[in-house]
């Protein structure tokens, strides 16, 4: 026991290696010596108890056990055990000790002169989370060796005996060793009965025994590898290579799987891409007749069958027009032929599918007027910078997980140069395209075109309004190849640092089925937001939100300044159709930032209007201008006016349905016993596309294969019933009579290519190809017969 006290800093030996600057305590060494001598004068059995008691105190979690031991063996204030306890509590943690256990043995000011001892004492107090007995013994020994250098007077420092002399576990007291390596199995039977009773009353959380038992056995230890490896000439935070190790990426698997599995495949190339093949489909016991498809279309869209737009473009091109457009320049010398020379199959069903549009000056002007000009000004913002800062701060705290973000450097660096290499794979670009950097290129100049294929019209307005084609504004190839990889790297980083409830389904595999099925089933209300004129309604506020958020993601500031300054005012030219005009902050629908920028704007709007951190919100999905929020209780609507007054957007909240990206979401069981969120395409849009007017013999095989991939989810009666019910409620507000039968007939229609042609284009599809009529020369006999009849 005397040796133990000397290890704690007390003793009576002669001083060695002291300096004159050391603090002189107010008490004398003789007082401590008398107390130590009194402690050593007790009988051997009681000294054994003291050894156990001191060992308990050395384990930080056993403080309560030491107090219980004190009450049973020497609970009186003047007993030797009580004095040892007071001395220990004073040196280890004075703040936690009771008032009676703080004696004036050592002046508290002496700690200020020995900072190294303060650090050791703090380490004793904070690091007793021991995982096994071996580590416990080694740490106790290290701390005892550190405490040996604690001086107690100005002229003397009391040395401790050598490590060989410090024998906490002697042959006489084997009980101490067995107690330090304590467990239910190795408590000796000869231990005194009162001590056994006390041990049996100890709470389970006091010792590290439960932590040891909670450790699960593993087949092999996990090797911790460095996540990044720096190059010789790189800056400290540059990334050269991401080592494909499972352990650093394990926290990201859930968030990557809910967004883009191609990003995870870049980090771990052996990762399999998930599919819906694991979904359990019961199959169809019957197939409907293809003739019911027309009945289903007439039920939902009663006037579509009467509309044939074959000659609509001829009427537009040959009629007088009066357009109210913004300032633009028109080259009237440009004229393009709008007549089509393609030989396409004539569809059998009258679904209201639109014909292909040809790019002409008139079509370009009509599309530009609708998509780019006459921008609505609904917002009421007076200090754009302060509002942008507020919106971005709310977006960062809501969407970004700081624990995931800290794994990345502060900026996108040389490690992500692989995005440039992957982008040009298979493109074989001209080397001259890389001759000039972006700084000397005209980033503010865009080209323009219209989309020839129009989206299906899903409402009953086809007989009232002629749909306009969408427009595309795009850069030259050299600018696209230099800028797209930067935004791809930023998008990958964004998907890696999202919070668990946020999902951005994107990439080659649009993984809506990776949404958390448990969170989806726990949601009873779904907030679907339909933004109108989303691209052209964006103004300076959206411009600043994107710039500051992308800077936070690590895109270099020089590139962001160059890019967004060029987007303040841009020149757009459609030289093929002879139309030239300017735009300011609105979205360029074909540049490298279109999808990522729209997604950032959508998330910023949602975060500012709704409290997405509320536990009531179970999941949030954002993809471009589409969004869906699942909640337990209905979201408050008192701030939804901010979509219009603050963000200058026309927002509609049509239905309480799990619908996003033209897909209905339902949960389905899997063959492995789990469940998954299954996205099913909008049935009404599929039925309209069955009457496509642009299918010919050259593209039929690809068109047929795309349909096989689309209708794979309709191989189950439960899926068909659920989706048909949601579609009928969405468009009719009542049950449908024909939709289920029409969806059941899809499997029969696409059972084979020959049958598909017979069902959709006619029984003999070869004779159903458009053939230009040719003039037949009339014979003289025909002329004589007509004259005879006359």
From Swiss-Prot:
Keywords: Nucleotide-binding, Nucleotidyltransferase, RNA-directed RNA polymerase, Transferase, Viral RNA replication
Renumbered residue ranges of the record's region Disordered: 771-790
GO biological process annotation, one example: positive stranded viral RNA replication
Listed GO MF terms: nucleotide binding; RNA binding; RNA-directed RNA polymerase activity
Catalysed reactions, as listed in the record: RNA(n) + a ribonucleoside 5'-triphosphate = RNA(n+1) + diphosphate
EC number per UniProt: 2.7.7.48
Residue ranges of domain RdRp catalytic in the record: 524-639
Broadest EC class assigned to this enzyme: transferase
Superkingdom, taxonomy of origin: Viruses
Biased composition (Basic and acidic residues): 779-790
CDD domains noted in UniProt: Bromoviridae_RdRp (cd23252)
Subunit note: Interacts with replication protein 1a.
Similarity comment: Belongs to the bromoviridae 2a family.
Purpose of the protein: RNA-dependent RNA polymerase which replicates the viral genome composed of 3 RNA segments, RNA1, RNA2 and RNA3.
UniProt protein name: RNA-directed RNA polymerase 2a
Organism: Alfalfa mosaic virus
């Amino acid at each position: 026991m005397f040796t133990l006290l000397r290890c704690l800093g007390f003793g009576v030996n002669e001083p060695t290696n002291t300096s004159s600057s050391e603090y002189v305590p107010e008490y004398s060494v003789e007082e401590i010596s008398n107390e130590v001598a009194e402690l050593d004068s007790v009988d051997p059995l009681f000294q054994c108890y003291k050894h156990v008691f001191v060992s308990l105190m050395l384990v930080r979690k056993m403080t309560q056990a030491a107090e219980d031991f004190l009450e049973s063996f020497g609970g009186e204030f003047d007993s030797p055990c009580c004095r040892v306890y007071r001395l220990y509590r004073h040196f280890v943690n004075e703040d936690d000790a009771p008032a009676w256990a703080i004696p004036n043995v050592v002046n508290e000011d002496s700690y200020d002169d020995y900072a190294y001892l303060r650090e050791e004492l703090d380490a004793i107090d904070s690091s007793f989370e021991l995982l096994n007995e071996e580590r416990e013994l080694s740490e106790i020994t290290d701390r005892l060796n550190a405490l040996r250098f604690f001086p107690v007077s100005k002229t003397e420092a009391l040395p401790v005996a050598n490590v060989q002399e410090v024998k906490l576990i002697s042959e006489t007291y084997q009980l101490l060793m067995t107690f330090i390596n304590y467990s239910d199995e190795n408590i000796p039977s000869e231990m005194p009965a009162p001590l056994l009773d006390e041990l049996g009353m100890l709470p389970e959380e006091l010792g590290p025994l439960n932590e040891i038992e909670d450790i699960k056995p593993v087949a092999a230890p996990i090797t911790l590898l460095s996540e990044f490896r720096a190059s010789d000439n790189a800056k400290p935070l540059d990334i050269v290579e991401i080592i494909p190790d499972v352990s650093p990426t394990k926290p990201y698997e859930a968030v990557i799987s809910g967004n883009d599995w191609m990003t995870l495949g870049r980090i771990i190339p052996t990762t399999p891409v998930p599919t819906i093949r694991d979904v359990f489909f019961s199959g169809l016991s019957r197939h409907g007749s293809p003739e019911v498809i027309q009945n289903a279309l007439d039920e939902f869209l009663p006037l579509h069958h009467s509309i044939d737009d074959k000659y609509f473009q001829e009427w537009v091109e040959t009629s007088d027009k009066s357009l109210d457009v913004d300032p633009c320049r028109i080259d009237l010398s440009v004229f393009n032929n709008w007549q089509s020379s393609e030989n396409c199959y004539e569809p059998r069903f009258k679904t209201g599918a639109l014909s292909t549009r040809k790019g002409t000056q008139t079509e370009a002007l009509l599309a530009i007027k609708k998509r780019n000009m006459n921008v609505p000004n609904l917002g009421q913002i007076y200090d754009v910078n302060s509002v942008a800062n507020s919106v971005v701060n709310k977006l960062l705290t809501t969407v970004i997980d700081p624990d995931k973000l800290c794994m990345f450097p502060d900026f996108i660096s040389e490690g992500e140069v692989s995005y440039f290499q992957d982008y040009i794979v298979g493109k074989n670009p001209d080397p001259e395209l890389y001759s000039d950097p972006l700084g000397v290129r005209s980033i503010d100049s865009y080209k323009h075109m219209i989309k020839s294929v129009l989206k299906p019209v899903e409402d009953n307005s086809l007989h009232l309004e002629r749909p306009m084609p969408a427009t595309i504004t795009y850069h030259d190839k050299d600018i696209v190849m230099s800028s797209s990889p930067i935004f791809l790297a930023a998008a990958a980083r964004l998907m890696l640092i999202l919070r668990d409830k946020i999902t951005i389904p994107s990439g080659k595999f649009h993984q809506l089925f990776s949404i958390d099925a448990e969170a989806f089933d726990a949601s009873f209300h779904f907030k679907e937001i339909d933004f109108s004129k989303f691209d052209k309604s964006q103004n300076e506020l959206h411009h600043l939100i994107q710039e500051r958020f992308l800077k936070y993601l690590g895109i270099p500031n020089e590139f962001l300044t160059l890019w967004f300054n060029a987007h303040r005012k841009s020149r757009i030219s459609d030289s093929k159709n002879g139309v030239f005009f300017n735009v300011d902050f609105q979205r360029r629908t074909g540049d490298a930032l279109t999808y990522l920028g729209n997604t950032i704007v959508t998330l910023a709007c949602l975060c500012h209007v709704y409290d997405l951190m509320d536990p009531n919100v179970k999941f949030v999905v954002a993809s471009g201008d589409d969004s869906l929020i699942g909640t337990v209780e209905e979201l408050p609507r008192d701030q939804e006016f901010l979509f219009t007054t603050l963000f200058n957007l026309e927002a509609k909240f049509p239905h309480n349905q799990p619908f996003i990206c033209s897909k209905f979401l339902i949960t389905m069981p899997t063959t492995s016993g789990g469940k998954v969120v299954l996205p099913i395409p909008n049935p009404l849009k599929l039925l309209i596309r069955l009457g496509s007017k642009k299918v010919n013999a050259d593209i039929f095989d690809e068109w047929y294969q795309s349909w096989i991939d689309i209708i794979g989810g309709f191989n189950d009666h439960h899926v068909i019933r659920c989706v048909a019910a949601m579609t009928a409620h969405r468009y009719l507000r009542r049950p449908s009579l024909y939709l289920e039968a029409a969806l059941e007939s899809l499997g029969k229609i696409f059972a084979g290519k020959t049958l598909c042609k017979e069902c959709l284009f006619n029984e003999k599809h070869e004779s159903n190809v458009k053939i230009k009529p040719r003039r037949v020369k009339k014979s003289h006999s025909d002329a004589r017969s007509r004259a005879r009849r006359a």
